[in-house]
């Protein structure tokens, strides 16, 4: 209704993105009722936060199904349309929980890091058809974030900071990545209130070699010590983004 009130056209679909057939129906509905499809924003998500040794199979499956499988399902359905028209843009939602890390979110982190890999693969596979794919790692208060359990004062303070960051701050970046004039593809952007970050992607940072090869002993005696200065600490997202939102 809000879209229509501002002069746009909108249709609603209440099916689950975790269902491959339902995702295809969503794409078909968009094409039939709106006259085409140019942009896909994979935004569906749920949380089932729990410390790893207490995580159930259902905790794992439900989060992976909505986030990672859901992103695949909708993207795969749209890929056929994009390929035929030789244009289109995907914007996927990843998270610093996967890119950096967080407590009690093994399911969510795995799904979100998987989405970053999915987006890069789509960018590589579909670039020949003038189709682009990027990720946004959003910092924003939403209904999903509102389900995070508050266990102590530190978590409560973090949640209060999150409440100051609205989804309206994310939308301009999603739109900018989707317009025809944009040539950006295969990238990951963090959006935190009025800040935009280009997030790094995995590349080698140090290397060692040994002409005669390695044994477990020489790995421990030589390889590990020579690379140890470059090890990443067990940071959480809030350790890296430790300042108040700007």
Regions found by a protein language model. Give the residues of each.
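C-terminal helical subdomain
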Residues: 156-246
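Active-site-adjacent segment of SDR/Rossmann-fold oxidoreductases
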Residues: 81-84, 100, 116, 121-131, ...
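Residue(s) in the substrate-gating loop at a strand-loop-helix junction
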Residues: 95
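The beta1-alpha1 cofactor-binding region of Rossmann-like NAD(H)/NADP(H)-dependent oxidoreductases
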Residues: 14-25, 57
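Substrate-binding pocket helix/loop in short-chain dehydrogenase/reductase
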Residues: 51-52, 59-64
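Active-site helix of classical SDR
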Residues: 75, 111, 119
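A glycine-rich helix->loop->beta "capping" turn
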Residues: 6-9, 29-42, 48, 87, ...
